Design a protein with these regions (language model features):
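Serine/threonine-rich low-complexity intrinsically disordered regions
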Residues: 1, 40, 176-179
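Sec-dependent N-terminal signal peptides of Gram-positive bacterial secreted proteins and lipoproteins
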Residues: 1-16
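Short non-domain terminal segments
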Residues: 2, 29, 54-55, 194-196
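Sparse, context-dependent recognition of short Cys/His-centered cofactor- or disulfide-binding micro-motifs
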Residues: 2, 58, 75, 150, ...
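Active-site beta->alpha N-cap acidic-glycine motif
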Residues: 14-93, 97-98, 108, 116, ...
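Catalytic domains of cell-wall/extracellular-matrix polysaccharide-remodeling enzymes
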Residues: 64, 88-197, 202-207
Length: 207
């Protein structure tokens, strides 16, 4: 009888292991340098189709020119971040000018969408911690650089990203190229199939 109970317990435990829900791994898709008058909208269509949230780090000079695309990003529920006004290395500027590069974008985003932004991606990944304290902005870098701006080879972009992907990674892309739109769609599908859950960067860095 004791042996029978032991076997039953083992079978129940094994069944529980097989039926348990697999844990999802969070990953964030981010886009720099937008908005683009054509490819931002194409990217938004892909994200809507795949039901995936993303984070867009906008350049002020582009956001000013393509305000409708900024509103579309916000209306679809994506997170908007700051990428300075002119894509400049903030540490190369006088403090006041560096501050204005960031504040001007935040002000414009709030004007266009009704909400400001707390997140900044410094161009070239170079940041000044003093700006973080003074402007109360949270810098967001990346862990996977797709290098999508260097090639139109969609396969190369996809394979590099999927091979490097891990839990809580932040993927850097640019919504300025047709090849990036195509690659993003395939990356999303591949990583979903591997059990990844796409989230906005705030859910990764605050995890």
């Amino acid at each position: 009888m004791e042996k029978f109970l032991t076997v039953c317990a083992a079978l129940i435990l094994t069944a529980g292991m097989w039926s348990a829900e697999p844990e999802t791994r969070k990953i964030a898709l981010t886009f720099d340098d937008g908005p683009h008058p054509v490819y931002t909208e194409e990217m938004l269509k892909v994200l809507e189709q795949e039901q995936v949230p993303a984070t867009f780090f906008l350049l002020g000079e582009n956001a000013e020119q393509y305000g409708e695309q900024v509103r579309m990003i916000a209306e679809q529920g994506h997170l908007i971040g700051n990428h300075t006004w002119r894509h400049v290395q903030v540490t190369s500027l006088p403090k006041e000018e560096a501050e204005e590069e960031i504040l001007a974008v935040s002000s414009l985003v709030e004007e266009l969408t009704g909400n400001g932004t707390s997140y900044v991606r410094p161009p070239f990944g170079i940041w000044d911690p003093e700006l973080e304290e003074k402007l109360d902005m949270i810098p967001v870098l990346w862990t996977i650089d797709t290098l999508d701006w260097t090639t139109q080879n969609v396969d190369r972009i996809v394979e590099k990203t999927v091979q490097d992907a891990g839990e809580n990674d932040i993927i850097l892309m640019h919504d300025s190229y047709e090849s990036t739109v195509q690659a993003a769609e395939r990356i999303i599908r591949r990583l979903k199939a591997e059990g990844f859950e796409f989230v906005t960067v705030d859910q990764v860095i605050m995890d």
